[in-house]
Amino acid sequence: MFFRVFLHFIRSHSATAVDFLPVMVHRLPVFKRYMGNTPQKKAVFGQCRGLPCVAPLLTTVEEAPRGISARVWGHFPKWLNGSLLRIGPGKFEFGKDKYNHWFDGMALLHQFRMAKGTVTYRSKFLQSDTYKANSAKNRIVISEFGTLALPDPCKNVFERFMSRFELPGKAAAMTDNTNVNYVRYKGDYYLCTETNFMNKVDIETLEKTEKVDWSKFIAVNGATAHPHYDLDGTAYNMGNSFGPYGFSYKVIRVPPEKVDLGETIHGVQVICSIASTEKGKPSYYHSFGMTRNYIIFIEQPLKMNLWKIATSKIRGKAFSDGISWEPQCNTRFHVVEKRTGQLLPGRYYSKPFVTFHQINAFEDQGCVIIDLCCQDNGRTLEVYQLQNLRKAGEGLDQVHNSAAKSFPRRFVLPLNVSLNAPEGDNLSPLSYTSASAVKQADGTIWCSHENLHQEDLEKEGGIEFPQIYYDRFSGKKYHFFYGCGFRHLVGDSLIKVDVVNKTLKVWREDGFYPSEPVFVPAPGTNEEDGGVILSVVITPNQNESNFILVLDAKNFEELGRAEVPVQMPYGFHGTFIPI
């Protein structure tokens, strides 16, 4: 009540109240705590009303190639020296042509450089072949995930008709708009998405230095934007291949070091091929799991109709039209031994779900334990049409409330299954998890998950973009992970999850939308949360500044922020590179 009376008084007596109050609220802990405890919108188990419009976070912005000094508030640890690199869509139209889907926007690279308590920001559009071709014609020339490029209006009717019959996988027509993630192979950094192409970048200048095509090295039609790494730098990924015997999923291994300075992914190998359960409808997947000894691939009922995809251009449809949620199919787990490339014989199934990001996986007592962010509805890709994300009022509320929410779940996959194990036996020996693996009459194993959360996470809208202290705890038993809460269509909070006690710590500031959290360990730490969390926090409010946030990873309290007076769109993934 005090704050409301005070607010009324200020507004009644000062024309500068709108500019003054946000600054004061950010700086004074008492007001910040009050605002944090004041409900800004009604939310009951994912049903939200009165969501603010976030369209400004999903519109074209200008790049900022010259470094901009940020205004630092609070404390940036002196040891925090390096660059937070992020990538995401930043341009959503060329001329009169507009993209349809969030995933389609042209890649914009962001760099927050931190040195001795100071922060400098800059951004550049990736000079991909797609970006340059679209810019030269001032229209969309190359199709993207949710947008079909229209025929050249300068061509005659016959030429435009015949252009419909160009296969979507033809190299000249395949996008190299790598806007999803930074990945590392042999010490170099690449921008990637899920096509054949990656773009090698100079992480200091943000300039593209080389375009790399997976299919020039191995027989794959693309790879994920979420590889995994062994301690020696060996990288593993998953790719696709379509041949005379149908569709298959490929486990890929990239060696850790270069033989020659000029090489890229030379020496890459396919170590295992997994046949698709349904030849004409393989699964769409975004990531996979890895332990010290095993790769875990999840074949989920989010299906790619190969016929629809192959004929998409003829039918005047985008690639995304060929992806559908088919809940009549169960989810299947495949386990591959990394050393030999052998696909293990166990057949593990669970009820239908969709996962985009795995949290972590590890081995214990002859089992693989894998933790995932899961959704029970596979229509998320449809939700992220730009027309949905840019809605306001009741229309926005309806889109959000109809969207599937993502929650952390644990599955157990027993590796050494006896042929004599009785039907109905739970084959998991693990006392610390309620996840079960029950043998069926046909020899398959039915896996039921354990929820790694309580009701409070439902009130936060679920969680996505999970991150851990990867270098030390990937593939090992762990205690914490970090992610974004989704009481909106984009992340509106940062969350620390204790997977052992199933408790949460939450950071939120009303009207601001944080990016995927990145954990940076303090020098010499062995603790899972001994460091800081970095996140880029943006707002649609033109009277406020976007900023990079630093949280103490242990107590999840703010240490500092560095404000940048530049418009930024909501992005996907990133990484921290120390110097």
From Swiss-Prot:
Its cofactor is Fe(2+). One of its GO terms (molecular function) is oxidoreductase activity, acting on single donors with incorporation of molecular oxygen, incorporation of two atoms of oxygen. It is found in: Mitochondrion. Its EC number is 1.13.11.-, 1.13.11.71. It comes from the Eukaryota. The keyword Mitochondrion applies. It catalyses: all-trans-beta-carotene + O2 = beta-ionone + all-trans-10'-apo-beta-carotenal; 5-cis-lycopene + O2 = 5-cis-10'-apo-lycopenal + (3E,5E)-6,10-dimethylundeca-3,5,9-trien-2-one; 13-cis-lycopene + O2 = 13-cis-10'-apo-lycopenal + (3E,5E)-6,10-dimethylundeca-3,5,9-trien-2-one; lutein + O2 = (3R,6R)-hydroxy-alpha-ionone + (3R)-3-hydroxy-10'-apo-beta-carotenal. One of its GO terms (biological process) is regulation of mitochondrial membrane potential. Keywords: Dioxygenase, Iron, Lipid metabolism, Metal-binding, Mitochondrion, Oxidoreductase. GO terms for cellular component: mitochondrial matrix; mitochondrion. InterPro entries: Carotenoid_Oase (IPR004294). Signal peptide: none annotated. Binds 1 Fe(2+) ion per subunit. Highly expressed in retinal pigment epithelium. Also expressed in stomach, small intestine, liver, testis, kidney, adrenal gland, pancreas, heart, skeletal muscle and prostate (at protein level). Its main location: mitochondrion. Fe cation binds at residues 226, 286, 357, 573. Belongs to the carotenoid oxygenase family. Broad specificity mitochondrial dioxygenase that mediates the asymmetric oxidative cleavage of carotenoids. Cleaves carotenes (pure hydrocarbon carotenoids) such as all-trans-beta-carotene and lycopene as well as xanthophylls (oxygenated carotenoids) such as zeaxanthin, lutein and beta-cryptoxanthin at both the 9,10 and the 9',10' carbon-carbon double bond. Through its function in carotenoids metabolism regulates oxidative stress and the production of important signaling molecules. This is Carotenoid-cleaving dioxygenase, mitochondrial. It comes from Homo sapiens. The gene is BCO2.
